[in-house]
Amino acid sequence: MERWPWPSGGAWLLVAARALIQLLRADLRLGRPLLAALALLAALDWLCQSLLPPSAALAVLAAAGWIALSRLARPQRLPVATRAVLITGCDSGFGKETAKKLDAMGFTVLATVLEMNGPGALELRACCSPRLKLLQMDLTKPADISRALEFTKAHTTSTGLWGLVNNAGHNDVVADVELSPVATFRNCMEVNFFGALELTKGLLPLLHHSRGRIVTLGSPAGEMPYPCLAAYGTSKAAMALLMDAFSCELLPWGVKVSVIQPGCFKTESVSNVSHWEQRKQLLLANLPGELRQAYGEDYIEHLHREFLHSLRLALPDLSPVVDAITDALLAARPRPRYYPGRGLGLMYFIHYYLPEGLRRRFLQSFFIIPCLPRALRPGQPGATPAPDTAQDNPNPNPDPSLVGAR
């Protein structure tokens, strides 16, 4: 097929014009991403000239160049000025690190903690400016939430409240739904959903006035059925849906809502081995005899060891999550969802596009590889035949002496 040079030249002229405008505005990221984009555009140019008529080639090349330069634009950030932000759960992890970064940027930070004299609160007092204010708050106590609302109003009379970061979260069991006490589900919902809901609703008048931001820490466990995290995951799923509702309803008020869905990061609470050991012992101590007989203590020990093994993959650098929270607060056009962390793109692709059996096996291999409960193992007294489960289970008859080994 004869090649037409004019669509190529016209498209490249449009791309060059936009690139020049972005350069003059200091709104174009230079370096390898730009070189890669130009190489891909050159390859697309050759394909378009070979396969498409002139008008279609011009349209495709111009659109591709426009999209590429849009992706390479520097994110437009709002000035910090005198903005104030309330962050919950600043005793450790994402909340503490976000409070430190926003304080260093010049924000007025209102940070809630469970313990005013705990290590996290002491660290924030030592390394942050006097602008940072600490408040003790337990999201399961309505009186604490009411006090936090009054505290926030009192400390933002001159600046207004620009943002709320719903970071505080709770999970204290890693076990099958049948083994998890109903109280665990209630506790997760109280902190991760109802407490955050009450606080958010109470702050909406201030956020209406500032046309500010709501940023909420979610979890992929709220979108994918992670093994043994049902109590935590259901509360995070409820919170994510609530934020989607807020996003639609608050749009006329100019309030923007973002949900951060982080991967596996090594926060203090997640990597606290002694805490998880205590929770396992408490679960075993309160397990009804019938369930203890059906599942076996070695089954729970296996889940515990698998969970601790999965934590070895946790990322120690929390900055991707902190950066995502910062962008959601200051970007001119914040994203509705942020996915900081390694491998999340692959996980979501598998979850949404591959068959259910493959999805389940992938999550198990990534997080907790299950074994059969005692009552389903061949050779056990009163064992229940389970041909379907045995066929799907990668480890149907584990040797108790090797439970948790890899």
From Swiss-Prot:
Binding-site positions, NAD(+): 82-111
Q: Which UniProt keywords apply?
A: Endoplasmic reticulum, Lipid metabolism, Microsome, NAD, Oxidoreductase, Steroid metabolism
Point out the gene that encodes the protein: HSD11B2
Subcellular location, record wording: Microsome; Endoplasmic reticulum
Q: What is this protein called?
A: 11-beta-hydroxysteroid dehydrogenase type 2
Q: Which residues form the active site?
A: Y232 (proton acceptor)
Biological process according to GO: glucocorticoid metabolic process
**Primary localization:** other
Family (UniProt): Belongs to the short-chain dehydrogenases/reductases (SDR) family.
Which species is this record about? Oryctolagus cuniculus (Rabbit)
Q: In which pathway does it act?
A: Steroid metabolism
The role this protein plays is: Catalyzes the conversion of biologically active 11beta-hydroxyglucocorticoids (11beta-hydroxysteroid) such as corticosterone, to inactive 11-ketoglucocorticoids (11-oxosteroid) such as 11-dehydrocorticosterone, in the presence of NAD(+). Functions as a dehydrogenase (oxidase), thereby decreasing the concentration of active glucocorticoids, thus protecting the nonselective mineralocorticoid receptor from occupation by glucocorticoids. Plays an important role in maintaining glucocorticoids balance during preimplantation and protects the fetus from excessive maternal corticosterone exposure.
